[in-house]
Amino acid sequence: AAVENYVEKYPDKIHLIDGKSTGGAKYNFFYLFGQVEAPYYMTCDQDDVWLDKKIELTCDKMLTIENKADVPCLVYTELRVVDSELNTIADTMSEYQSLDCHKRTINQFILQNSVTGCTMMVNMALRDKMLHITDIDNTIMHDWWAALVAAQFGKTAFIDEPTILYRQHGDNSLGALGINKLSYIVRRVWQKKQIQESMRLGRLQAREFAKTYNLPTDSLAVRYAALEGKSRRVRQRFYKENDMYKTGTMRRLGQAVWG
């Protein structure tokens, strides 16, 4: 009812897309991207709080990197992690998750995503390129796919300033994790199956990416996907040769032991 009220109040600004559920966050966002024609797109989760300058800062940065309309461009920002009452848990998501958002090469994005979808802006060229995807099932999340496309074919930029209050709670699909907390460390380091499954899904996504965009056999995505079934020694040599390491001590350790 709240949404309908806003539509009635601002009919020229708000359009309700009354579609049925598509099966989860990534499916919903891919569906929505396909329903709207606009020069720029920003995605939002229902319980996030946007700070006053979020749109202005993001749009200004977009305009500085978008020198051609046909170049896929992505801008994303820092977040402040808060609880359900908006009390600060961590000043920045980068600190909380041990992320390095300044490492934005295709090598890094194939291995690890640092883009949080509710902070990103994509231009039409990126939206169009993203929608070439052939099988959404083989992606991990829509924001990761956007990062891959922008890094491979266009430009990315990061704003090192929080533009959003990101609520951390049990309902987040892929929410923030306090990766440096002792409880996380003890629980995670020895979770061999979970770490290996995470790496497997990343290789599956890389294969889908290479197939969707018909990348050459010597491309990084193709070669990374081909690690599936290879020995640990082969995988570790590949990471070293291509400078592909996850950020954060614990992720790096998990990659070294089980990746």
Residue ranges and their predicted role:
Residues 1-178:
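Nucleotide-sugar donor-binding/catalytic module of glycosyltransferases
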Residues 131, 135-139, 156, 165-259:
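C-terminal subregions of glycosyltransferases and related glycan-biosynthesis enzymes
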